[in-house]
């Protein structure tokens, strides 16, 4: 059996948004209208089709991005529902990596919220074309044009409405299509009574004004259209659509549409927009990769004729079939039962079965083609970000980069039986989620788990209990501090031991200097004339890397420094790799007195939404937590305070905000950057870590 849908008629899209903007409901409705679901599940009743892990149904938020296939007007649409909660940014990163386009869902009352900014930035990094869907037009305080304004102000994005709502809040009962110059009126909230009519008289003037603005914005990006526009010629619907499509797929323009997924309004037009304006796998640039042995760069085009290549973007453990590996096929064809090469790990893998996923049911298929998204059963060594490819034509596609965890807690099993199971559970969970780490603290022997935030770790512990039946006690959260150097110095490290028999000798001079923020550790060899033999130089680098894991001030990892090996000496008989490793770590310890080491802490971008009367208390509270208020604005009848606050001061903030605002305030936070800790705090951290 050949391909069911051509590449032009395939769309791989993600649905991304801030928590509670309604994107799971939007996805549900898409599945409903494309004939994949027979009854609609409401998120707030805990029965949504996409949210299928137990915790998601309880909490009403989406944690794992489920990949689902739907069909609309002769097109196949593969949808990945991504979580909007900041602790799960890794899920969003992974999804964006394998998508061709995305729908950003906004809440019509709030517009762009902090998590929207984060996800938008991630999508820009990966060059993903987007449509913006302003959802919840039926909500009190819904304001379409305000929401569009926030896209310009907060995201600096070239976004323009291609629709306008008719009415808002309870009165929201239609949508004007500016491209086709018509309107859709809704007779009820079930989406069963929709009529295409002329634009109502009272809305004509506004519609004309916004259609003019739309044509102008698109013409600016299209020379031919610009000429016609300037000469006053009529621009046809087809030309306008083609112009919008071209500008959207080249990520220069973002069409904005509106609706209410919950009330079944605007969903079909959203699907039309996905097909009209988002790219097919043929519209996006060919993916680049490198050939493992030669490091030469190669391209893989989206075509069934090319050699097979795919990227594994998600691992899940399924109670019935075991380990599922979700992958996106970039080129070629794969049959179930065949062998592929995991070129990242250099391992051969057998693809047992291939499943096409619907939110929580699955359909077995025998072949996947270029542009498809599917899940494989039977892969043993493959983890997130690995490349799978044809054994005869190896390639490694660019992998994904994941942020380092910012928060950790100690965890201990409640009983001996739990202890054995806990190791397995943690290994499986960290395989699924690259931003979750588990390790044993060498000094205390405790098991430490680290992740992107309190909710992230809560859910991990919860999953251990439910899926792996492990009961565990969790300690207080710890912040992932870092250390770095503020000044440069040249220091010596000398290790010489002579105690009968063969001695040990290693001697180095290393120049340390601060590196740019986020650049990590860089080691350079500047030895001339062989004063340290070449075979010992990697040992110096390795010795420094080991020593950097436990910093010099308070034992935190040292980041963002450069080290250059400039001089040293060796002994013909007594020198060894080990001796040079130790000498390098001695040099790092000696650098403490000279390089002005400091402690860095994670700073969180915090947004607090509160009724006006609590403004004073909240501002005072933020300042008392060493926070810097960076801006305030009114949103509807509430006030929004934006601030930068150290993570260490944010523990338990949810409880304190609840009591300060009688439960009427909400907040969200996202990791922003590392910053130097004030001296007084730094002294406390050092004291605490040295057990004084």
Swiss-Prot record:
Record localization: Cytoplasm
GO biological process: ribosome disassembly
GO terms of molecular function: GTP binding; GTPase activity; translation elongation factor activity
Ranges where the tr-type G domain occurs: 8-282
Residues annotated as binding GTP: 17-24, 81-85, 135-138
Keyword Protein biosynthesis among UniProt keywords: yes
Keywords recorded for this protein, A-Z: Cytoplasm, Elongation factor, GTP-binding, Nucleotide-binding, Protein biosynthesis
InterPro entries reported for this sequence: EFG_II, EFG_III, EFG_III/V, EFG_IV, EFG_V, EFG_V-like, EFTu-like_2, G_TR_CS
Chief location category: cytoplasm
Gene Ontology cellular component terms for the protein in this record: cytoplasm
Pfam family, one: EFG_IV
Described purpose of this protein according to its UniProt entry: Catalyzes the GTP-dependent ribosomal translocation step during translation elongation. During this step, the ribosome changes from the pre-translocational (PRE) to the post-translocational (POST) state as the newly formed A-site-bound peptidyl-tRNA and P-site-bound deacylated tRNA move to the P and E sites, respectively. Catalyzes the coordinated movement of the two tRNA molecules, the mRNA and conformational changes in the ribosome.
PANTHER family (alphabetical): RIBOSOME-RELEASING FACTOR 2, MITOCHONDRIAL, TRANSLATION ELONGATION FACTOR G-RELATED
Family: Belongs to the TRAFAC class translation factor GTPase superfamily. Classic translation factor GTPase family. EF-G/EF-2 subfamily.
Protein name: Elongation factor G
Protein source organism: Bacillus cereus (strain ATCC 10987 / NRS 248)
Gene name of the record: fusA
């Amino acid at each position: 059996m050949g391909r069911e849908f051509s590449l032009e008629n395939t769309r791989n899209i993600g649905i991304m948004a801030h928590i509670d903007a309604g994107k799971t409901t939007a996805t549900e409705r898409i599945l409903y209208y494309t004939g994949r679901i027979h009854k609609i599940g409401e998120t707030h009743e805990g029965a949504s089709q996409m949210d299928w892990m137990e915790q998601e149904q309880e909490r009403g938020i989406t944690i794992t991005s489920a990949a689902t296939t739907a069909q609309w007007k002769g097109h196949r649409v593969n949808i990945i529902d991504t979580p909007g909660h900041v602790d799960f940014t890794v899920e969003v990163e992974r999804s964006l990596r394998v998508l061709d386009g995305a729908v950003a869902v906004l809440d019509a009352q709030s517009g762009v919220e902090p998590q929207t900014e984060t996800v938008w930035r991630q999508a820009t990094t990966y060059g993903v074309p987007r449509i913006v869907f302003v959802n919840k037009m039926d909500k009190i305080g819904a304001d379409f044009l305000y929401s569009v304004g926030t896209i310009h102000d907060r995201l600096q994005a070239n976004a323009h409405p291609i629709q306008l709502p008719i009415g808002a809040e309870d009165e929201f009962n239609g949508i004007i299509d500016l491209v086709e110059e018509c309107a859709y009126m809704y007779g009820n909230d079930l989406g069963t009574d929709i009529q295409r009519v002329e634009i109502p008289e009272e809305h004509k003037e506004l519609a004309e004004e916004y259609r003019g603005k739309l044509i102008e914005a698109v013409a600016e990006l299209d020379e031919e259209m610009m000429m016609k526009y300037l000469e006053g010629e009529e621009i046809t619907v087809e030309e306008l659509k083609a112009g919008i499509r071209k500008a959207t797929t080249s990520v220069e323009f973002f069409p904005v549409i509106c609706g209410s997924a919950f009330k079944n309004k605007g969903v079909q037009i959203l699907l039309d927009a996905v097909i009209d304006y988002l790219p097919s796998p043929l519209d996006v640039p060919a993916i680049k990769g490198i050939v493992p042995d030669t490091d030469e760069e190669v391209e893989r085009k989206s075509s069934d004729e090319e050699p097979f290549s795919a990227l594994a973007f998600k691992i899940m453990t399924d109670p019935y079939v075991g380990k599922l590996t979700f992958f996106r096929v970039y080129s070629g064809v794969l049959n179930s039962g065949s062998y592929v090469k995991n070129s990242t790990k250099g391992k051969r893998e057998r693809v047992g079965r291939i499943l096409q996923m619907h939110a929580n049911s699955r359909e077995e298929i025998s072949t996947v083609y270029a542009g498809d998204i599917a899940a494989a059963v039977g892969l043993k060594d493959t983890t997130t970000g690995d490349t799978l490819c044809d054994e005869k034509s190896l390639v490694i596609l660019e992998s994904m980069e994941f942020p380092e965890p910012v928060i950790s807690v100690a965890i201990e099993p409640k009983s001996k039986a739990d202890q054995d199971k806990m190791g397995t559970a943690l290994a499986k969970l960290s395989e699924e989620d690259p931003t979750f780490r588990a390790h044993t603290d060498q000094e205390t022997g405790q098991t430490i788990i680290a992740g992107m935030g309190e909710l992230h770790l809560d859910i991990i512990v919860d999953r251990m209990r439910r899926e792996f039946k492990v009961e565990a006690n969790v300690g207080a959260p710890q912040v992932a501090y870092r250390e770095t150097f503020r000044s440069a110095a040249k220091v010596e490290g000398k290790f010489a031991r002579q105690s009968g028999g063969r001695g040990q000798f290693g001697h180095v001079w290393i120049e340390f200097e601060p590196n740019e923020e986020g650049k990590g550790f860089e080691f350079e060899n500047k030895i001339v004339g062989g004063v340290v033999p070449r075979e010992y130089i990697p040992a110096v680098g390795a010795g420094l890397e080991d020593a950097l894991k436990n910093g010099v001030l308070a034992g935190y990892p040292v980041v963002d420094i450069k080290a250059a090996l400039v001089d040293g000496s060796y002994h013909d008989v007594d020198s060894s790799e080990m001796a040079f490793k130790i000498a390098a770590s001695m040099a790092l310890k000696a650098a403490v007195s000279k390089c002005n080491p400091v402690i860095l802490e994670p700073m969180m971008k915090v947004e607090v939404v509160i009724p006006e009367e609590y403004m004073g208390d909240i501002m005072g509270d933020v300042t008392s937590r060493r926070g810097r208020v960076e801006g305030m604005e009114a949103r509807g009848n509430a006030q929004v305070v934006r601030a930068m606050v150290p993570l260490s001061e944010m523990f338990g903030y949810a409880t304190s905000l609840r009591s300060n605002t009688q439960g009427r305030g909400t907040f969200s936070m996202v990791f922003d950057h590392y910053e130097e800790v004030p001296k007084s705090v730094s002294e406390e951290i050092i004291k605490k870590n040295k057990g004084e």
